[in-house]
Every structure is written in C-alpha cells, then in structure tokens.
C-alpha cells in the first residue's frame, strides 16, 4: 500500500495543531495564482516530484469546496500537472457529502455562532467514494475527467 498525498488549500494546511498532522501526512499546500503565485508554483513542483517518485497524489480539480454540493467546473491545474508528467489518472468521486459535517453552510457568514457551526444536517452521513478505471495521462483533459467524475456521482450530463 502507498499513502496518498493530498493537495490542499494553504490556509487550511496552516491551521495551528492541524498543520503538524498535514505535514506528517505530507500534504501539499497550494494557493491560487492571484493569491500567491510562488506558492502555487511550489505546489506544482512538489506534485511533479512526488509523481516522479511513484507517489500517489490526490487533487480536487475544482479548486475549492462548492457552495451547494454540486460539482464546479474543473480547473486546468490537472492539465498543467499532466503536461509535465503524464501519469495515469484515477477519477474518483465522493457521494453524499452534502449535508455532512464537511459541507459548507449556506449562511456561514451571517447569523449566530450556531448558524456558523458545522453541525451535520443529517446524522451519520453515509459518504461513499466511487472509483473509475484509470485514464491515460497523455490524453486526459479537465473536461474528460470532469465528465467521468460527474458520471460516477450520477449527475446528469
């Protein structure tokens, strides 16, 4: 078994106490190009080095948590990674995340502290990870991968 290295937003990566856990897990912090282009480039370099060593790297090609639980359009970062290192890509999807403690709250910036808490909308959410066959990294595009992930989730095309 090989551990998976997750690419994650640097502000989450840098949460006190959690940072130690993320560093120990060898997570890769990333920022948007407008926010911190140097950190973004370092993240792409670290992803490339990890893939060159045969490590598994997990990215969320949308670039952020969605506000409504639906898939947002995939960004081109996956294509940038594959242009440097065309490794096989295993499309994966999470089902039933919306309403769990990991979803955003629609009113997170307004209302009381209770409104802003990440209290699950349903108890014991049954989250599923579904996996498709690998896609050749030399031919994979953000559009193709997004379509595969949508199909895994059962989203209409």
Predicted regions located by residue number:
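Catalytic core of membrane glycerolipid acyltransferases/transacylases, capturing the structured
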Residues: 1-37
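Cofactor-binding loop segments of dinucleotide-utilizing enzymes, especially the Rossmann-like FAD-
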Residues: 9, 62, 94-97
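Amphipathic coiled-coil/heptad-repeat helices and related helical stalk/stem segments
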Residues: 14, 40-44, 74-75, 113-114
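Hydrophobic/aromatic ligand-binding patch that stacks against planar heteroaromatic rings
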Residues: 21, 49, 80-84
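Helix-adjacent hinge/juxtasegments
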Residues: 28-53
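Catalytic-site beta-strand/loop segments enriched in glycine and acidic/polar residues
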Residues: 48-79
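A cross-family acyltransferase "interaction/gating" segment
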Residues: 67-140
């Amino acid at each position: 078994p090989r551990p998976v290295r997750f690419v994650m937003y640097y502000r989450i990566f840098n949460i006190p106490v959690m940072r130690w856990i993320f560093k120990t897990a060898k997570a890769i912090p990333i920022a948007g190009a407008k926010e911190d282009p140097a950190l973004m480039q370092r993240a792409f370099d670290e992803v490339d080095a990890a893939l060159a060593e045969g490590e598994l790297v997990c990215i969320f090609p949308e670039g952020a948590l969605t506000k409504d639980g639906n898939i947002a359009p995939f960004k081109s970062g996956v294509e940038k990674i594959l242009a440097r290192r065309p490794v096989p890509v295993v499309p994966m999807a999470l089902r039933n995340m919306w309403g769990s403690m990991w979803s955003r709250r629609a009113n997170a910036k307004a209302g009381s502290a209770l409104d802003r808490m990440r209290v699950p909308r349903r108890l014991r959410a049954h989250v599923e990870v579904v996996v498709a066959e690998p896609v050749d990294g030399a031919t994979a595009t953000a559009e193709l991968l997004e379509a595969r992930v949508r199909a895994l989730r059962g989203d209409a095309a």
